[in-house]
């Protein structure tokens, strides 16, 4: 056999293996859900306003959050004021000034009729069972939990997904009951992007 052919075959094999390995690592990362905790069955009273209310927790340095905010925009366009929204923005204690600006935080602030709440050290999110950026809890008009989970199909990917469908169905009166979903995103606390 020709040594040049053997070398080319080996190079092609190494290249193909590297490409496949990279693809599998990316696939695994994209579809590995974040941690979830049990959300309270009743909304904290200071969030209740007589209509559906969605609470979302975000880490302003998590790149996955951009897709969650885009999906929130889509949900709000279809629910047309039938739901209040509060976004809990993780802020580490003593570093608020450095964290006050940023593309994701500015994007969250640009969403009309959404309340932005600075969540120092993620304590509010933690009390609501939200430990992953992009986690949401939907509560009905009576303050009962109707959905907890995420609103993206994988990390950082926009498009149709189970969580968004459930929220739309609940708010638009097509279904009732409580459902849970998967959250894809970065951890709210102890996030490697914090440093």
PLM regions and their residue ranges:
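Alpha-helical transmembrane signal-anchor/signal-peptide segments
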Residues: 30-43
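Short, internal strand/loop/helix patches
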Residues: 104-139, 145-146
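Short active-site neighborhood of thiol/selenol oxidoreductases, capturing the structured segment around
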Residues: 46-72, 82, 86, 167
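Structural microenvironment flanking redox-active thiols in thiol-disulfide oxidoreductases
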Residues: 66-108, 123-127
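Thiol-/selenol-based redox modules, centered on thioredoxin-like
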Residues: 146, 150-195
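Short, Lys/Arg-rich N-terminal segment immediately upstream of the first membrane anchor
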Residues: 1-6
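Hydrophobic membrane-insertion alpha-helices, especially the h-region
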Residues: 8-27
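Short, thiol/selenol-centered motifs that function as redox-active sites or metal-ligating centers
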Residues: 59-69, 93-97, 184-195
């Amino acid at each position: 056999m020709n040594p040049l052919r053997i070398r080319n075959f080996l190079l092609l094999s190494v290249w193909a293996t590297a490409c496949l390995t990279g693809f599998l690592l990316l696939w695994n990362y994209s579809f590995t859900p974040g941690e979830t905790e049990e959300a309270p069955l009743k909304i904290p009273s200071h969030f209740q306003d007589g209509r559906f209310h969605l609470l979302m927790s975000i880490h302003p340095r998590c790149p996955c959050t951009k897709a969650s905010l885009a999906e929130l925009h889509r949900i709000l366009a279809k629910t047309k004021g039938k739901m209040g929204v509060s976004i809990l923005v993780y802020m580490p204690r003593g570093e608020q000034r450095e964290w006050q600006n940023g593309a994701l935080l500015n994007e969250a602030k640009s969403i009309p009729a959404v309340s932005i709440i600075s969540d120092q050290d993620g304590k509010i999110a933690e009390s609501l069972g939200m430990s992953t950026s992009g986690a949401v809890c939907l509560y009905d008009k009576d303050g009962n939990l109707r959905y907890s989970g995420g609103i993206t199909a994988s990390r950082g990917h926009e498009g149709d997904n189970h969580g968004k469908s459930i929220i739309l169905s609940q708010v638009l009166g097509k279904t009732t009951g409580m459902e849970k979903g998967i959250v894809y995103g970065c951890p709210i606390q102890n996030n490697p992007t914090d440093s």
